[in-house]
Amino acid sequence: MWRRFFSWFVKITGWLPWTIACRTKVYYQNKRVQSRKIKGKAIIISNHRSVYDFAMMLFLFPCRTLRCMIAEVMFRKNPLFSFFLKSLGGIEVDRESHDFSFVQKGYDILQKNGVVEIYPESRLPEKGEETPLPFKPSTAYMALLSQAPVIPVFTNGCYFKKKRNKVLIGTPVNVWEWYDETLSEKENLENITNRLRDTVIELQNEFERRENKKENEKA
């Protein structure tokens, strides 16, 4: 209850400043299938361009309390910021250890029809790296375990700049449709993880086609 109240407080007080500063434009792969309203349990995945991606998601899906997987480094900045992230429902992922309790926490949330937000790249890309970075398998494992649909999102990662923030929401994916009984669990996890990454890449390509088409129409 506290997280839900705090999340709504942040969204209500932050909506206008965020809208003015970032001017987020939302596109849809198929709005009839998936809009900004999420019904039931779901896992949201996205490419990772900026530390502000987390804030953008709060306002992209305002009607749900998103429980975001966040790297341990963000919780170690200072106690106040750590409290802020936890109050918003942030789940700490310690990438330096072999503690996978975050997967169980995500599963428990999904079992209660909650929404989990994951950045499968697990870190921001460095200059010159091909994006999106390789995905970690925890998303695929959590989706298989919970049978929750995966909603892919692509963002151009532009915040507080002259260039407008733009987002493309894809259609949900049922990862069990990719499960191959002839493969081992490890092979299935690897295959599904790669296909989830391919799905985000397809969104990125579609986004770029739409942007190029607009530029050509202006020319």
How would you describe each model-predicted region?
Residues R23-Y27, S97-F102:
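Glycine-rich, highly charged phosphate/nucleotide-binding loops
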Residues M1-F5, M69-E72:
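Compositionally biased, charge-rich terminal segments
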Residues W2-F5, V103-A219:
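Non-catalytic C-terminal accessory region of glycerolipid acyltransferases
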